[in-house]
Amino acid sequence: MSRRPNFGGMGMGGMNMQQMMKQAKKLQAQMAEEQENITAQEFVGKSADDLVVATFSGDRKLKDIKIDKDTIDPDDPDMLQDLIIDAVNKGLSQIDEATQASLGKYTKGLM
């Protein structure tokens, strides 16, 4: 019968469960702070020539949208729709990039 190695109550490379929980709570607090920082920021997406400008909060809520009055053409609603989609997508992409840059260091290797 083989004996199991004795790690003196320690596991995971010498770190006990209490230390692991303390470290996990510390990381959780750091991640929450990073998320709060992102949420407090504003992100602005702009279409070509700034004809449509969409402003978001960091929690992905649309706060404002500005449409250049010369862009509104009743005969071409598709162009305005495309400009709005472009501005909104650019704003959301900025939030995603900021989130990845800020929180990616915590999730690296988990996915």
From Swiss-Prot:
Keyword flag Transmembrane helix: no
Pfam families documented for this protein: YbaB_DNA_bd (PF02575)
InterPro entries in the cross-refs: YbaB-like_sf, YbaB/EbfC
Keyword Cytoplasm applies: yes
This protein's UniProt keywords: Cytoplasm, DNA-binding
Taxonomy, superkingdom: Bacteria
Compartments in which it is found: Cytoplasm, Nucleoid
SUPFAM superfamilies: YbaB-like
Family under the similarity heading: Belongs to the YbaB/EbfC family.
Subunit and partners: Homodimer.
Protein name: Nucleoid-associated protein LBA0378
Organism, scientific name: Lactobacillus acidophilus (strain ATCC 700396 / NCK56 / N2 / NCFM)
